[in-house]
């Protein structure tokens, strides 16, 4: 089973991780890639560099960042492979132990 994990940190946007945090996360990523559970992962740049595109009927609207709602800010994503939703949840808990406070939404990918 594949899952898309979307991470929304509680920290204010643009708060950089410490060198130690980066090292611990780097080790977690390396081990997770080797095990085959982590397929891809990347962090996102600040929302000021992004945009939201919406379609309603035949009209499109574009709103440039930054976005003010902190609960809507995406810090990064991961694509993981696990044997079950329960295993994906446990993997995500391990990630959050390192990343810190925040929320990760997991969505199973249609295969």
Spell out what each predicted region is.
Residues 1-111:
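Conserved, structured core segments of small domains
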